[in-house]
Amino acid sequence: MVPREGFLALLSVRACCFLFFLIRARQAFSQNQTCDSKDLNALLGFANELDLAKLGWVLNGSSSGCCCDWPGVTCGPPTVNGRRVVGLDLGGKSLRGSIPYSLAGLDQLKRLDLSVNYLQGVVPPQLLRLHLLEFIDLSTNQLEGVIPSNLSLPAIQVFNISYNQFTGGHPILGGSSNLTSFDLTSNDFYGPIDAGICNSSAKIRILRFSENRFYGDLPGGLKSCSSLTELWLSMNDLGGDLPDALFDMTSMTQLFLQGNQFSGDLSTNMSNLSNVVEIDLSLNRFSGFIPDVFGSLAKLESFSAQSNKLEGNLPSSLSDLQSLRVLNLNNNSFSGEINLNCTAMPKLSTLDLGSNSFSGPIPDMLPHCVQLTTLNLGNNNLTGEIPHSFKNFTSLSDLSLTGNHFSNVSSALQILQYCPKLTRLILTRNFHGGEMMPVDAIQGFRKMELLVIANCALTGSIPSWLANLTRLKVLDISWNRLSGSIPTWLGNLDDLFYLDLSNNSLSGQLPNSLTQMKSLVSGNKSPRVSSTENFPFFIKRNSSRKGLQYNQVSSFPPSLILGDNMLVGQILPGFRNLVVLHVLDLSWNNLSGNIPAELSGMTSLEILDLSHNNLTGAIPSSLTNLSFLSKFDVAYNNLVGQVPAEGQFSTFSRSDFEGNPGLCGFLSSPCESKDPLPPASRENNIVTLKENKTKSAIVSLLIGIGAGIVTIILLAVAYRVFLKSYSGSVMYC
């Protein structure tokens, strides 16, 4: 048994040894965290330029040399002089400023990520000569300048400077045999693509040059890119035929060539791309037929060739693509019947065949595409009625059948109401037989957000079943022959923010409920329609009497468009509540009374059209407070007084006020002075006034005769233009 004193002595020795071990371990750890002095100076210069103390970098004091534990800094193994910095990962840290030249002092750096910041200025050339650098990502900043054409980065594997403002010819990574990803997307590079881009980089798999200004033909040297899996060249000025070498890249999975000027026929060699998953050839000048090679593209999930000059029938092999999810051939010249076998296309979710020349009926088999959510057959020559099989669409949310020759609107709505997920429906420019909107028998459409049935010559009144569409955000039933009054319940649809009832025969007064629309009053979430990729949303571009034109967009401005009806009564002062409203169009009605000064409360208003009514009184000066007002039209009323000249009113034209003889001042006739004249001046003015009246009478007579002749000519021309344009007055793209 060990004596008590011996045990304590042994314990003390062991405790001392353990304490010594801890001290040595701490010293070793501290030494392991110490930077090489050269790297430390480079980091301190970098940190001082970009204020990196906020990230936890210790820039002074006894711990300032321990840079290897700073956030985003990676060091290599210990050396005699300390650890060397090999990685700097500061992506998405809200860094502001320019990249200092001192950063190039990190000569052992292998990885540099400064992406998604607010960096400006040029990239130090020395930084692009670091011979060990394998990964560099400067994407999504505001960097600019010219990148040297020949970079010396022998170890580089990933080079990403996308989404900046670089210019000049694209850099060439000569001698970079390990390069796998090269991304220049969304800059201002220009010139031809170098023919030898893959000569020394045979391992390159990802090449992204989209959204620049590259021009010329695709080089045949692309055949050296044998390992390429992704080729992104969209939105440039490239042209010519596609080289055969492009279709020798059998590893290709993604091919994006949209938004260029490529032309010619599509090669049958496309069948060689047996691994391709996505192809986008949209917005080019390709012509001829689509080769019937889809049977060889078993992995293809998305094929888009919209806005070209392609023609002929749909290739039969399209129906062999069980993997296909998206087919977009919009805006070409395809013809014949739509002959797709949906039973063999179980994954198809988006089918866009709009703006072609397809004819015949809608095929009954379409609902067999059980995952179809978006269907656009608009602007073709399709005929007949909506198939009863459409009741079986269980996933369909977006449907556009605009601009065809369908009949029986009642049947169409009664069938489509059974589509449980239908959210957006466009039936414009169909049903031209003067059919009546169905009054009842409609119980569905409970998820409907957007309903457009414009320019269909529909008769009757606004149907009451629309009141049940409680999720409705956009309603456009303009350019029909609807009559009766505007229902009060329209103002009770909580989500409705875009209402177009223009160019009908509606009568009565404006319902007060329109001034209480919840989506347009203060305190509500900004109104919008949820966007679906590849579905054509439409917004009114102008509402001239020559017809309506629509642009394809993803959202609508909050609007009340009630022009070209027979509405009477006064403009409601309560419109001041609609502080979210952007467009108020009450033109071409029979409204009377004054323009309410309260309209100045519509603080978001951009367009106010009150022309061609019977309004009286003065233009309220308070309207000059509408700072976003870009269009104001009160022509052809009975307004009097001085036209305001402040604010946005200084930007309006004379034509916006014409047809109001009582208006004076800015953009109109001068207002008469109210100050009395002295007696002597008054007598002289009486004589002068008589002489001027005689001269004015003669001049007015001559002007009147000339104006009358010109007016008759203009009316004749305008009438012919109106007749010509009314037949196709609503245009969708």
Feature-to-residue mapping (PLM):
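Plant-biased, solvent-exposed loop and capping regions
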Residues: 1-733
